[in-house]
Amino acid sequence: MSTSEFVLAQSATVPAPDIEYGQLSPMLIVFGVAVAGVLVEAFLPRRGRYSSHLVLALGGLTAAFVAVVLLAGTRDSVVGGAVAVDGPTLFLQGTILLISIPAILIIAERSVDSGVAAATAEVTAVRGAEPEGGTDAFTPQAFAVPGSVAEREATRNAPGHTEVFPLTLFAVGGMLLFPASNDLLTMFVALEVLSLPLYLLCGLARRRRLLSQEAALKYFLLGAFSSAFFLFGVALLYGYAGTVALPGIADALARGTEDRTLALIGTALLSVGLLFKIGAVPFHSWIPDVYQGAPTPITAFMAAATKVAAVGAMLRIFYVALPDLRADWRPVMWGVAILTMVVGAVMAVTQNDVKRMLAYSSVAHAGFILTGLVAANRAGLSSTMFYLLAYGFSTLGAFAVVTLVRDSRGEATDLSRWAGLGRRSPLVGGVFALFLLAFAGIPLTSGFVSKFAVFQAALEGGAVPLVLVGVVSSAIAAFFYVRVIVLMFFSEPQSDAPTIVVPSMFTAAAIAVGVVVTVVLGILPQGALDLADQAAVFFR
């Protein structure tokens, strides 16, 4: 072999990357269980799929959370620097997994929809059927035309659409990777992995099929559009810095030897993709339609977990890659946060549908969360992570309650139908009132502590006007929350009042978890606040 051939042979050798499987174990477990779920769909008889999926999903999520706990204190970057394992990553991954476990229970519920038939017989409480014998919230055949013979035949032949379990787990895996991504290409892959299953899941509602399919189509088209903005921003930042690694972009900006116009435009486009996922104004138009049309268990999962993942990714980009552009992005985020809080609160007042009201409430909360990001200090980071934890469980519980109020068409989400609900079922009305009070930020609930924490961090960061707007928006939001409580407890029930379904232990457990977390974080929040503060250091 000649010298040139030897050199060529050496240069053609590509070293295998070092993959730290232990530090990636939470994500690997979830993705592994998701793949196993696909195999269950392919090889197990239909009758055994439901229970197998449920055991796999709950076991996998629990194992992944244990892996997160075992990684506590780790500060490192793995897979060639593409993934960061640090305090914010582990805190947010733990939050996503803890939210996903009760979300799976709500998705697995099969007794609630069985109460619809009983609703036409004016039954006020329906005992749940066994999960294997009942029906879930998902259509058994997604491609069938709504109301067609094929759909009715599929409903008779199949009890449910068990593919929702692996789809949900793939979305969870993408959510775990999203806030951990330490370069922009990995972040884009995570964004698509979490988004694609959600596009499908939004269109699988058993009831109100056309509304569900419309929601899925809107979410897909607008989501693809926002992903294009994100990818274009990645290209421009790469053009400026010569790297997609977040620390590398920060180093290029710190040197400051070139015109930053390319970096500023790239940051703006990148922000569009992230603000869309968060549901911030003016990129919020999809939120009310998708939240209303999607199956309510999926709405609950999206509203809680997706926001955690998207905010985590946004925190990493702005705190790790773009600290030297703080003077440029902070004023813009001020404006976005103010618009989001005000528009979300005002629009929620005008809604007559419970799910749309909660959707605009989610928009307003995105503004409160951005207040912590705008603080641009450690207190802002820790308070934002605490807010995501508190908000996630309250949101999950609130949407779980919505699944229990039903009539012959499915969920009775028209607000007028909730009149007297608290009188007919004090427990259901009281639980929903608790979640609404938490959203309003009333003391002794997690919502009060989380809002106080982000406002205090913003004050430390000099964002006094932003805090004033936040307080006013909270007051506006409190009006429509209290309006619903008054409607439930101080109004006469309608003659054709909806059925209040007694769920199986799955939904009951999910609601109970939401109640416990909302109350405990409101009365004894210090442990979670300290944990968030200890985790509030990014690995660079």
From Swiss-Prot:
Keywords: Cell membrane, Membrane, NAD, Quinone, Translocase, Transmembrane, Transmembrane helix, Transport. GO terms for molecular function: NADH dehydrogenase (ubiquinone) activity; NADH:ubiquinone reductase (non-electrogenic) activity; quinone binding. The chain crosses the membrane at residues 24-44, 54-74, 88-108, 158-178, 184-204, 219-239, 263-283, 295-315, 331-351, 357-377, 385-405, 428-448, 462-482, 505-525. GO terms for biological process: ATP synthesis coupled electron transport. The keyword Transport applies. The keyword Iron does not apply. It is found in: Cell membrane. It is a multi-pass membrane protein. Its EC number is 7.1.1.-. It catalyses: a quinone + NADH + 5 H(+)(in) = a quinol + NAD(+) + 4 H(+)(out). Its main location: membrane. GO terms for cellular component: plasma membrane. InterPro entries: NADH-Q_OxRdtase_suN/2, ND/Mrp_TM. Belongs to the complex I subunit 2 family. NCBIfam families: NDH_I_N, PRK05777.1-4. NDH-1 is composed of 14 different subunits. Subunits NuoA, H, J, K, L, M, N constitute the membrane sector of the complex. NDH-1 shuttles electrons from NADH, via FMN and iron-sulfur (Fe-S) centers, to quinones in the respiratory chain. The immediate electron acceptor for the enzyme in this species is believed to be a menaquinone. Couples the redox reaction to proton translocation (for every two electrons transferred, four hydrogen ions are translocated across the cytoplasmic membrane), and thus conserves the redox energy in a proton gradient. This is NADH-quinone oxidoreductase subunit N. It comes from Rhodococcus opacus (strain B4). The gene is nuoN.
